[in-house]
UniProtKB/Swiss-Prot annotation:
Consequence of changing residue 552 to A: Abolishes AMPK-mediated phosphorylation
Basic and acidic residues: compositionally biased ranges: 734-745
Taxonomic lineage: Eukaryota, Metazoa, Chordata, Craniata, Vertebrata
Organism for this UniProt entry: Mus musculus
Residues annotated with S-nitrosocysteine modification: 619
Modified residues (Phosphoserine): 23, 29, 33, 37, 45, 191, 246, 552, 675
Protein name: Catenin beta-1
Residue segments, region Disordered: 34-57, 720-781
Amino acid sequence: MATQADLMELDMAMEPDRKAAVSHWQQQSYLDSGIHSGATTTAPSLSGKGNPEEEDVDTSQVLYEWEQGFSQSFTQEQVADIDGQYAMTRAQRVRAAMFPETLDEGMQIPSTQFDAAHPTNVQRLAEPSQMLKHAVVNLINYQDDAELATRAIPELTKLLNDEDQVVVNKAAVMVHQLSKKEASRHAIMRSPQMVSAIVRTMQNTNDVETARCTAGTLHNLSHHREGLLAIFKSGGIPALVKMLGSPVDSVLFYAITTLHNLLLHQEGAKMAVRLAGGLQKMVALLNKTNVKFLAITTDCLQILAYGNQESKLIILASGGPQALVNIMRTYTYEKLLWTTSRVLKVLSVCSSNKPAIVEAGGMQALGLHLTDPSQRLVQNCLWTLRNLSDAATKQEGMEGLLGTLVQLLGSDDINVVTCAAGILSNLTCNNYKNKMMVCQVGGIEALVRTVLRAGDREDITEPAICALRHLTSRHQEAEMAQNAVRLHYGLPVVVKLLHPPSHWPLIKATVGLIRNLALCPANHAPLREQGAIPRLVQLLVRAHQDTQRRTSMGGTQQQFVEGVRMEEIVEGCTGALHILARDVHNRIVIRGLNTIPLFVQLLYSPIENIQRVAAGVLCELAQDKEAAEAIEAEGATAPLTELLHSRNEGVATYAAAVLFRMSEDKPQDYKKRLSVELTSSLFRTEPMAWNETADLGLDIGAQGEALGYRQDDPSYRSFHSGGYGQDALGMDPMMEHEMGGHHPGADYPVDGLPDLGHAQDLMDGLPPGDSNQLAWFDTDL
C-alpha cells in the first residue's frame, strides 16, 4: 500500500489543469465537494481515505510537504507495484502487531505508520490481545515460580541450617531472591520451617551479607498479613530487635521497617517488642541522622508508648525525652517532625516524662514549629505544649513562644485557638516575666477579642478568662492590664459570663478576674453599671446554701460540682465584693442587697480563708456608720472578738478593724478597753511591741491598703480554675484549706439563710448542680 508521500508524488504527476484546480481549491476558504477538483474521485487506495489502517493526517503537515516538493518521482507501474506489496503483506502486518513472536527472523514488512508517535489502527487494536498474552505468560510464570519454590524450599531450609557458613550464605541469597517474587514469597511464608530457619540464621550469623539477605527476606514477607503471622509465630520479633544493634545500615532499615509493619498490623507484636527490649534499642537509634529511618523509629515508639505507662517510663529511663527534643530542634523533614511530635504528645501526659521534656527544652523546641505550613504538625505541637505548660511555669526564654501564641489567638481554627489560650493560661501562672511579656505583645487585647469571638464555647472562654485573671494581678503591668480590659470593651462580656449558660469552672474563673479588675478604681463604676454586684451576691447565696445544706445533713467533706467546690465560690464572690466595696457607691449597693447577715454568718466558717474575706468585706462596709450599726445588730461582736485570736494574721487584723470601726460612737471608756484588747491580741507574739504600745492609736479609716492583701502573707494563695494554672499571686486561696485550728466552727449556725430581697428571685438562673464536668484533662488522644 502506498505511503502518504507516494500519493502526493503521484498527484504532482497529474495533468496540469487538474493540478491547477487543486491548488486553486487549496487557496480558497470555501469547502470543495470534489466535483471540480476531483479531490475525492480517485480510487480509495490512492486517495488515502479509504484505508482503515491509515490515520487522519494533520493538514498542516501535508501542506508543508506539498510546498517543499519531492526529489523522487514514481511511474504508474511503480505505484501499482507498491500497492500490490502492501496488499500482499496485510496479513503479515496484522500478525506482527498481535503475535510478533511468530514471524521469521529477518523478515522485513513495509510499515504504514506515518508518524512514530501515533500508532496505526491495527497496532491499537492489538493492544488488548498483547495484554491478554502477557497476563497468560505471567500466570504461567507465577505457577512456575510457585512450583519451583515449593520444590526448592525443603532443600533451602536444610542449607540454611548447614554448619558451613558459605553454604548458609548462598542459601540466604537464594531465598532472598525468591522472596522478591510474589508466588515464591507466598510459598516461603506458608512454610513455618523455612521462616524459622530464616529467623534463626539472621539471629546467629556473623556474616554481614547473610544478615542482610535474611533481614531483607523477612522485610519482604512483612508486606503480607500471612507473612507477619509467620514471622510472629517463628519468634522473629526478638531476632529483629537484636538486629537493631547491627552496625550495617541496610540491616537496620530492614529490621526497623519489619518491626514497624508488625506493630501496625500484628496482634501481640507490641508486647513482644517490649519484652524483647525493643524500646531501649529504638531510643538508642534516635542519634542516627537518616531522617526517613528516624521517622519510622519514632513512629514505632509512638505505637509502643500510646496508652502504656510502663513503656513511657522505659523511654524516660533510656533518655528518650532529650533525644526527641533534639530531633525537634535539629531537623526540618516534615514527616519526621510530625512523628516525633506524636511521641512527645503521648509522653506529655505522663507526670514523670513531663518535667523531663520541659527541662530538655521541649517548650522552646516545639514552639519553633508553630508557624509551619503543615497543619498536622502545628496541631500536634500545640497539643503537646498544652499538656506540658502546667509544668513549665518556671521556664526561662519563653519570649518567642509567648509572642507566637498571642498571634495564634487570631486563628480561624478553633482547635488552634483553644490550645493557644490554654497554654497562655498556664504559662502566665505565677510567672511575672511571662505576664509582662504577654501584656507587652498585646495579649490583653487578643484575649479579650478571643472571649468576644468564642461566644459560649467554654473550652475557649475558660482558659482565656484564666489567662486574663493571671495578667491582671501582681506584676508591674497589672494596672495597665486592668485598664486595658475595660478599654478594649471587655467588661460587658466578662460580667455576662457570670450568667447562664456558664458552668461553674468558668464562673469561678470569671469571679477571680472581676476581683482583680476591681483593684483598678476606674473599673468600679463600669462593673456596677454592668450589674456585677447583684450577680456576685446571687452566686454567693447559691453556693452558701449548698454548703449549709450539706452541713445540716452531717456531711464533712467538701462537695465538687463540675469539678468546683462550692466553698471556692463562696470565697471568690466574697473576695470580689470585698474589693468592690472600696467604692462608696458600691458599698451602698452591697448593703442594699441585705448581705450583712450573710457576711456575719461566714465569720463562723471552718475555712480560714472564708473567715478572712468575710471580715474584709465587713471591714469595708463598716466605714459607713449605718452599716457598722447593722453589723453590730447582727451579733458580729462575738465572732469578731473570737477571730482576734486567729493564727491567721489577715483574719485577726480585719476582725480588729471591724471592731474598732463599730466602736467609733461608743463611750471613751469602752474604746479604751477595746484598744487594750485589740493590742494584746494583735501583738501577742511580740512582747517588745506590747511594751512599746500602750494604745493601738489606729486610724482605721486612713489605713487603706494596710488592710488589703499582703504579699508576705503566708496564707495568701491563688484563686484558680482547675487545670488552667494556679496563680498564687492572683485571687484569694480556695483550695486545700486547713480545716482545723482555733475557730468558732462549733457555733456555726445552720438554720437557713437571710432574705436577700429581689436577688433571690433570680436564683433559678444559676447553673445546675449536676451538669457535666468541663475540667481540663490530658489524654493520649
